[in-house]
Each structure stands twice: as structure tokens, then as C-alpha cells.
Amino acid sequence: MIDPISFLAWRFWYFFRDPVRRPPPGRNVVSPADGRVLYVRDVEAGTLPNPVKSGVRVPLDDWLGTVAPESGGTLVGIYMTPASVHYNRAPIAGRIVAVAPRPAKGENLSMARAFMRLLWNMPPYEEDCGYILQNARNTVAIDGDFPVVVIQMADRFVSQVDCFVRPEQQVEKGEKFGLIRMGSQCDLFLPKRAGVTITIKPGDRVLAGETILGTY
């Protein structure tokens, strides 16, 4: 049986903790979220593999919830566990180009399948995870040394996705820009022309604002 006091401490204190994060210097891209790397996907001709239907490709714009800055690149997915810090941070320094919320295509689906596949180390971790394309999301586009797109993705039980920034605002690498309440996911699209060398792989643990996802 769960101790009510322990649950309340987790829900209203531990869950919303906000530790200091120190972004590493240099030409690198840092993680926008705490959690586990769910996938590192190559994007070709504006499409990528459907996580539910084998052999079917999905338009990148549908995945992002907005128009992609480029048709080729890399998409990194990070599953934020219930134990993760749930603040999101800017992966690079730059100007906020757009903030675009998109409602769910139906109802938000549970992310429990992704959590269990990560827990039991069963790659590909995103297999049969229909929520990736269906759930509500908030997309933040940042233009710095190159354009990037960050997607805050809501879980079935998420009550709110908070975004603290607005278009034309300047952000520093590692600066907080949002918060997703309860378990959730955060994706990052890096365009091919950025020339980023990815330094992480599926299953890796990452910290928002500190873990380097790639260098350029």
C-alpha cells in the first residue's frame, strides 16, 4: 500500500523540483528533457517510419505538429519518467520563432507501453506506441546557429503542458522554457544541414540542459 504522505511529497514537491543545471560550453546541443532516449531517427525526404504500422512512413510535419524547417535530419525522442525533472530546457541558444500547440487527434493515449519497453530493455522502444502521432503537443521552434524544433508531448494523464516563452524571445542554451506535468515525452528535430554528430543512443539516460546530445 502506498503511504499517502510519501505520495503527496512526490506529487507536490519531488515532482516539481528544479535543480540547478549548468550547460556545457562549446558547440553542442543539450538535451531538452530529463529521461531515457526512446529513439534516434533519421528523417529522409520529410518522412520517417511509422511506430505503429511497419513499412509505412509518416510525414515529419505530422510528427512535429508544425511545418519542419527542413526535410532531412535527425529526430531524437526522450521519454520523461515519473522520476524525471519535468522542466524542459532550450537545446541551443537562439530566438523563439514559433510556439504552436496542437490538440490530440482524438483522446490522449497512455505512454505506459514505452515506459515498460524501456524498463525491460525491449528495443525498439517506440514500437506500437500510437500516442506519438495522436497525443496533444506543443511545438517550440528555435533559430540559433541553425533551426531546431522541440516537441512537448502530453501523456494520457497530463493535466497541463506549460510553455514559458513567446515568439521573438531570446533564450540561452539550457534555459527553462516549459514544464510538462506527470509522465510525458519531449522530442527534438535537428536539420541535416546543421551537421550535428549525434553522441547518444536509444536507452541512454539524459539530463535537461546538461547532457550533450550532439556536437557541431
Where are these regions (language model features)?
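Contiguous, well-folded functional domains in the mature portion of proteins
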Residues: M1-Y216
